[in-house]
């Protein structure tokens, strides 16, 4: 079910929203820099949990319904680690670009 180079459509669309919203883009970039440690795997895991918790907090509170079941099903499909790694790679690229420019 790969989609546009991502694990699946759900992961792609969550990342698309994060990348296309400047406030979210900056927020998760700052969060990633805080989470980065010597072990990138640990940073990916910690960042993925933080992102998932925030997105879960933003979900609308719905009564039990077909829509809630569909929303929960889609959220379970998101590969949060993949999104976290993408953000970490992005900030690494940005930092390298800044170093080279100076």
Q: What spans do the regions from the language model cover?
A:
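Acidic interaction surfaces
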Residues: 1-102
